[in-house]
From Swiss-Prot:
Species of provenance: Bos taurus (Bovine)
Name by which UniProt lists this protein: Mitochondrial basic amino acids transporter
Gene Ontology terms, MF aspect: basic amino acid transmembrane transporter activity; high-affinity L-arginine transmembrane transporter activity; high-affinity lysine transmembrane transporter activity
Transmembrane segments: 2-22, 61-81, 96-116, 153-172, 187-207, 255-275
Localization of this protein: Mitochondrion inner membrane
Solcar repeat feature ranges: 2-86, 90-178, 185-275
PANTHER family the UniProt entry points to: MITOCHONDRIAL BASIC AMINO ACIDS TRANSPORTER, MITOCHONDRIAL BASIC AMINO ACIDS TRANSPORTER-RELATED
Family statement: Belongs to the mitochondrial carrier (TC 2.A.29) family.
Membrane topology category: Multi-pass membrane protein
Keyword Zinc (UniProt): no
Single GO biological process annotation from the record: ornithine transport
Keyword annotations from UniProtKB, A to Z: Amino-acid transport, Membrane, Mitochondrion, Mitochondrion inner membrane, Repeat, Transmembrane, Transmembrane helix, Transport
Superkingdom in the source lineage: Eukaryota
Length: 298
């Protein structure tokens, strides 16, 4: 159990390092003004950030997801595994339900973490920055808006994370069964990369419009008076001003990010588990018994 958790954390770190630049681009595209858009698309956004802020601009707000990573993985692994055992049978439906439960519970950490990440990604570079880092960002929000401000976007985060984690674990379970992912298979790692990457894409496609609303709510008021009264008002205003396409803004960068992030996550998890269990077998004097371990979840 502890080894799985450690491997999951290592995989999560790898996933964040690979995917954060894409996430920065996604957020900036989602919240930019339709009247005066700063970026023409995903590629132009990448180029503009690097030109104006250097490559480090793509990693703005990185501290927030890294800071919450250990706790989020603990919740996801623990809740998903315990829920699956409580349901009594490892079936696709139970994988969905266990994943949905894990997604809902980890919102307690995910929502404030993403709020800080979004604010840091959107602030301008330079000495006049509002926030010095994720903790300073959350501390300032708490002083100004209280606990409610720190949890801004919680409902939309729940609406996104609950079904998306369910879809993720369901897709991953179906694909690993179909691909025949078994310990000792020499193609296990490529199969896990394919299953994990595809599952990540499926989970994002299932709830992406909700993510757009969540980003807008969490960025609301950063550059002036708040515009939205809540989720429904945000949806109505966004649709009225920009049409249905607003709910797919930044989707390209998100899907570009989804596959490599999950590929990096599962490759790292597999390597860590294999090395650790190989060491265990060596210490026990039975090196031949250490099979390549398949991670149980993201």
């Amino acid at each position: 159990m502890a080894l799985d958790f450690l491997a999951g954390c290592a995989g999560g770190v790898a996933g964040v390092l690979v995917g954060h630049p894409f996430d920065t681009v996604k957020v900036r595209l989602q919240v930019q003004s339709v009247e005066k858009p700063q970026y023409r698309g995903t590629l132009h956004c990448f180029q503009a950030i690097i030109k104006q802020e250097s490559v480090l601009g793509l990693y703005r707000g990185l501290g927030s997801p890294l800071l919450g990573l250990t706790f989020i993985n603990a919740l996801v692994f623990g809740v998903q595994g315990n829920t699956l055992r409580a349901l009594g049978r490892d079936s696709p439906l139970n994988q969905f339900l266990a994943g949905a439960a894990a997604g809902a519970i980890q919102c307690v950490i995910c929502c404030p973490m993403e709020l800080a990440k979004t604010r840091l990604q959107l602030q301008e570079a330079g000495p006049a920055r509002t926030y010095r880092g994720p903790l300073d960002c959350l501390a300032q929000i708490y002083r100004q808006e209280g606990l409610r401000g720190v949890n801004r976007g919680m409902v939309s985060t729940l609406l996104r994370e609950t079904p998306s984690f369910g879809v993720y674990f369901l897709t991953y379970d179906v694909l690993t069964r179909a691909l025949g992912c078994e310990p000792g298979d020499r193609l296990l790692v490529p199969k896990l990369l394919l299953a994990g990457g595809t599952s990540g894409i499926a989970s994002w496609l299932s709830t992406y419009p909700v993510d757009v609303v969540k980003s807008r709510l969490q960025a609301d008021g950063l550059q002036g008076a708040p515009r939205y009264r809540g989720i429904v008002d945000c949806v109505q205003q966004s649709y009225r001003e920009e049409g249905w396409r607003v709910f797919t803004r930044g989707l390209a960068s998100t899907l570009l990010r989804a596959f490599p992030v999950n590929a990096a996550t599962f490759a790292t998890v597999t390597v860590v588990l294999s090395y650790a269990r190989g060491e265990e077998a060596r210490l026990e004097g039975d090196a031949g018994s250490a099979a390549l371990a398949q991670p149980s979840s993201l």
